[in-house]
Curated annotation (Swiss-Prot):
Region of interest: G2: 278-282
Basic residues composition bias: residue spans: 121-134
GO terms under cellular component: chloroplast
Family per similarity comment: Belongs to the TRAFAC class translation factor GTPase superfamily. Classic translation factor GTPase family. IF-2 subfamily.
Organism for this UniProt entry: Gracilaria tenuistipitata var. liui (Red alga)
Compartment(s): Plastid, Chloroplast
UniProt-annotated stretches for the region G5: 393-395
Protein name in UniProt: Translation initiation factor IF-2, chloroplastic
Chief location category: plastid
Record gene name: infB
């Protein structure tokens, strides 16, 4: 018996489809890796094998049939060979379990019944006709798959449906769609939406992700378009009564790159100097008039927070903006929120201007900033690109007029229109509860004219407009398109970021609200962390920190939640009991007392009565005005609940010389061999290199005197209350415990 160095195809080619494969792939034989196979036959060369296969009656007949099939389908056999040879290097040889034959298979064959499935003779005869018709279709389909950029999961999930009826996290969406979270995150990032695996996204974004993978999203209100669809609709106004409207300009960029300072320079104010902590924590909108082409051009500016916690606020503003000012600090370059803005601008194809700020600083490398932007295909006009770059100093108000003129020029080019005669549509920038005014809603009118007495609807909230106040603080009777307004009259607090519209009557408003399913309401932050057990409840024994959040605006609550989601919760789970607008009430105190929760008040005042009541109940009630401080406080509170861990540090060794007994127990008379021994130190006793006891030095004496420590070369007596079995020559190792830095 001997071993040959070629495959015995009389064994491995046991069914006809393998012969077909070899006939149509002559290069495959040459590329085979030959293994030592137990055989009694004479060795055959690759040429002999190929000739044997090609000249078989079956393959001669099959070749003729394939030629005819190719002619019917308008294909040539040579084209088929070319296509099939693409993946020769990807073919795999494997042995089928419990079988004495080698099966040759390509990845595409594993799911292709006509080319790679193994069937009985009867089944083969039944499908022989089908095989002839489908050969070219399968080959053509394979080619298209290789050339297309569609996700390979598209075909798997084709024609499937998924229920998305509420906001959910990326991880929950991944489970629903059976798509890796990293893939969803990458896809959203390319669209300018930065998210993490634990971050909550609304129905509109989740629906877009599902539809990308050919899912049919069900159980939503079919009468309402997605937020993005509505946005597109609002911008596309062209009627006989249309007029030019002012552009909505949003300033985007990294925290502390000068967004608010730029607006101060434009408005001749000092809002940046008045901001707590020097950062913007809410959306601010302003109207500015600038002389352009012999007339005053009205510009609407929106200032957005740059801190990462306020990503949802930035997204809301970017959805309604016409022109983006991408501001970049010349001394800092591109940063995470800058890149987030670039990705969003790119995905939405929003017109934009680059403002390179802080050129008043010394030793700047402006070329470096331009080169960084060029990597994102943002090239200035003086470098041969299409984007206007304006170098400014917001602090010194340099080149501000040049920037404003560039904005007016771009607005003129994109030719924005709105119809003031139609029913009002717009977007809610912010909503909050004021102690004296009641429910206050900041809006921007995108089309139509808003009047006192109009019935206004947004999501599940509606009301009758009682008061309209413009950005200058003046009361108005009506306001047209591209107006920043403060509106009073809503009966309940609407969801920020939602679109609103005016309807003809309260009856119509109630009818619209009734058509919206309760599950379709956009993200409710109350109990948001608790609604995601898949994300947070990894360990049922994990300790929890209960929180009650009270804030001034819905946007602030969203930012707080986003910040908390970024905190690791492997050891301690955040449990948000309530998150609502308004002042701290006695009801909040009662809930905190029964659940031992921390009460957090952000940007709201706390009455003296509430403070006194909280103190009597020994409750933790803290007020914050900076999100940095709030996140630090919650993080430290979580760390307090983490059990301490220690490092054992060897501080000395001693050897037992003798032992004697006293009333309190057995004393070991020792001599310190290295380092020192300390009272209350942790010790380990070793006998013949084997650990026999671990405990604590309860008493340490030298010359009958109690001491706190004994250093090298000195004799001492050691007493451990729970150990009495000392022996001469026992080795004692003394340790100090150093607490490790706690982590979450």
């Amino acid at each position: 018996m001997r071993y040959s160095n070629v495959i015995d195809f009389s064994i491995c080619m046991s069914i006809k489809s393998e012969n077909t494969f070899l006939l149509e792939n002559p290069k495959f034989i040459k590329n085979l890796k030959f293994f030592n196979i137990h055989s009694s036959q004479e060795p055959k060369s690759p040429t002999d094998i190929r000739n044997s296969v090609e000249n078989s009656d079956f393959n001669v007949q099959l070749e003729n049939k394939l030629k005819n099939s190719f002619k019917q389908d308008g294909k040539q056999k040579s084209k088929k060979k070319k296509i099939l040879s693409v993946d020769l290097d990807q073919e795999h040889i494997f042995k089928k379990k419990n079988k004495s034959k080698v099966i040759i298979s390509a990845p595409d064959d594993l799911t292709n019944n006509s080319e790679g499935s193994f069937k009985s003779g009867k089944q083969k005869k039944k499908e022989k006709g089908k095989h002839k018709q489908n050969v070219n279709k399968d080959i053509h389909h394979t080619k298209n798959n290789r050339l297309s950029n569609l996700d390979p999961l598209d075909d798997i999930n084709k024609d499937k449906s998924v229920i998305i009826d509420s906001s959910l996290s990326i991880e929950e969406l991944s489970i629903k769609l059976k798509i890796p979270p990293a893939e969803i995150i990458t896809g959203l990032f390319l669209k300018g939406i930065s998210v993490t695996v634990n971050q909550i996204i609304d129905i509109a974004i989740a629906t877009q992700v599902a539809q990308k993978y050919n899912f049919t999203v069900i159980n939503q209100n079919q009468n309402n378009q997605s937020e993005l669809d509505q946005s597109d609709k609002l911008q596309q106004v062209s009627t006989i009564t249309s007029i030019n409207r002012a552009p909505i300009v949003t300033i985007l960029g990294h925290v502390d790159h000068g967004k608010t300072t730029l607006l101060d320079a434009i408005r001749n104010t000092n809002a940046a100097g008045k901001e707590i902590g020097g950062i913007t924590q809410s959306i601010k909108a302003y109207e500015v008039n600038w002389p352009y082409n012999s007339s005053n051009q009205k510009l609407i500016f929106i200032d957005t927070p740059g801190h990462e916690a306020f990503s949802s606020m930035r997204l809301r503003c970017a959805q309604i903006t016409d022109i983006v000012i991408l501001i970049i600090a010349a001394d800092d370059g591109l940063k995470p929120q800058t890149i987030e803005a670039i990705n969003y601008i790119s995905s939405k194809k929003t017109p934009f201007i680059v403002a390179i700020n802080k050129i008043d600083k010394a030793n700047l490398n402006l070329i470096r900033v331009r080169e960084e932007l060029a990597t994102y295909n943002i090239i200035s006009t003086d470098w041969g690109g299409e984007i206007q770059f304006i170098e400014i100093s917001a602090l010194q108000k340099r080149n501000i007029s040049q920037l404003l003129t560039a904005i007016c020029s771009l607005a003129e080019f994109i030719n924005l229109k709105a119809d003031p005669t139609e029913l009002v549509q717009g977007s809610i920038l912010e909503a909050y509860l004021d102690k004296t005014k009641g429910i206050v809603v900041n809006i921007i009118v995108l089309s139509g004219t808003l009047h006192i007495g109009d019935i206004i609807v947004s999501g599940h909230s509606y009301g009758r407009v009682k008061k309209i106040i413009n950005s200058l603080g003046n009361e108005l009777i009506q306001a047209g398109p591209s107006s920043i307004l403060e509106v009073l009259g809503f009966y309940s607090i609407p969801q920020t970021g939602r679109y609103f519209q005016v309807v003809n009557s309260e009856k119509e408003a109630k009818k619209m609200i009734a058509q919206i399913p309760l599950s379709g309401i956009t993200q409710t932050t109350k109990n948001i962390l608790n609604l995601n057990p898949k994300v947070y409840n990894h360990n049922l024994n994990t300790r929890s920190l209960n929180l009650i959040i009270k804030a001034d605006t819905q946007g602030t609550i969203d930012a707080i939640i986003n910040s908390f989601i970024q905190i690791s919760q492997k050891k301690i789970k955040l449990n948000i009991l309530t998150a609502s607008l308004g002042v701290v009430s006695n009801t909040d105190l009662d809930l905190a007392f029964s659940t031992q929760a921390l009460i957090i008040a952000f940007n709201i005042n706390i009455s003296t009565n509430i403070l006194n009541a909280a103190e009597k109940l020994n409750l933790s009630l803290r007020k914050f005005v900076l999100i940095y401080d709030l996140v630090d406080y919650v993080t430290y509170s979580m760390l307090d609940l983490v059990d301490p861990e220690y490092d054992k540090i060897l501080i000395g060794q001693a050897e037992v010389q003798t032992t004697f007994t006293i009333n309190k127990g057995t004393v070991a008379g020792c001599i310190v061999k290295s380092g020192k021994l300390k009272k209350d130190a942790l010790i380990g006793v070793y006998r013949k290199n084997k650990l026999i006891y671990e405990g604590v030095i309860n008493s340490l004496k030298r010359m009958k005197n109690d001491v706190n420590e004994v250093v090298i070369g000195n004799e001492c007596g050691i007493l451990s209350k729970d150990y009495h079995f000392w022996q001469s020559e026992d080795l004692i190792k003394a340790y100090e415990l150093h607490e490790k830095a706690k982590t979450l």
